Amino acid sequence: MSHASDPKKAGAHGDKSLVVEHLRKEYVRGKAVLKDISFTVSGQSTTAIIGPSGTGKSTLLRCINRLIEPTAGRILVSGEDVCALKGTALREARRRIGMVFQEYNLVERLSVMENVLCGRLGYISPWRAWLRKFPQEDIDRAFDLLDMVGLADFARARADELSGGQRQRVGIARAVMQEPHILLADEPTSSLDPKTSVEIMELLRAVAEKRDIPVLVNIHDVTLGRRFSDRVIGMCKGEVLFDDVPSALQDDHLKQIYGGEEWLQ
């Protein structure tokens, strides 16, 4: 099954799309961490990226949201090449890229509500941001999102009072608060117990469907990735070795991606 990059096709979903074309990343010249990565995601889809540790999965997501600079290639978010942007234009483009982090990245001393409202910082003036003065419509939207993630009763609680699963729910609400065109999740379940991991993946899939945006999840748990995704991208040593629907992912593919058979036992 082919998933070739096609910006025109991606734009057919209200321009909420991500197109990665021939992406390459080198930290040391001549030694690529990402090698010629190309794919397109659009619409209300959930895509799982699997592969061994150190294979470039997190680097890929960090290139997409420009936390790090790609060495070559293009990354189009809603048809705009974010690799070509700088300054104000880049900051505005990054509003459209929601990010859920492995370690939550919450401001521990702030309340749950204040952390969710941080998702609007790119939309308000610097003085409003400094004083944490948000429009009432943003506050109303934040309450709605806390209800969506099951934390309506925790709005005034400090972030450092929450469990890991609750913190990740806040992180998801904060990312959705940006009104992103795409949502990236970097190992969102790696620090969570099995039950909470399932709940977080269910929530991410619900975000894709309810917000009509593509969700791209870097995940270490192959079973979870298969269960909650519409598509699986398998990576090894900076290259894409598999790109298809979950039902097509067989043990032979997993041996190729992860190397050897021991881990299948």
From Swiss-Prot:
Classification via InterPro entries: AAA+_ATPase, ABC_transporter-like_ATP-bd, ABC_transporter-like_CS, ABC_transpr_PhnC, MetN_ABC_transporter-like, P-loop_NTPase
Pfam family, one: ABC_tran
Domain named ABC transporter: residues: 18-262
Protein's organism: Nitratidesulfovibrio vulgaris (strain ATCC 29579 / DSM 644 / CCUG 34227 / NCIMB 8303 / VKM B-1760 / Hildenborough)
GO terms for MF: ABC-type phosphonate transporter activity; ATP binding; ATP hydrolysis activity
Family: Belongs to the ABC transporter superfamily. Phosphonates importer (TC 3.A.1.9.1) family.
Protein name (record): Phosphonates import ATP-binding protein PhnC
Keyword Nuclease: no
Keywords: ATP-binding, Cell inner membrane, Cell membrane, Membrane, Nucleotide-binding, Phosphonate transport, Translocase, Transport
Catalytic activity entry: phosphonate(out) + ATP + H2O = phosphonate(in) + ADP + phosphate + H(+)
Coiled-coil residue windows: none
Record PROSITE patterns: ABC_TRANSPORTER_1, ABC_TRANSPORTER_2, PHNC
Mode of membrane association: Peripheral membrane protein
Binding site for ATP: G51, P52, S53, G54, T55, G56, K57, S58
Broad class of the protein's primary localization: membrane
Leading EC class: translocase
Domain of life: Bacteria
Task of the protein: Part of the ABC transporter complex PhnCDE involved in phosphonates import. Responsible for energy coupling to the transport system.
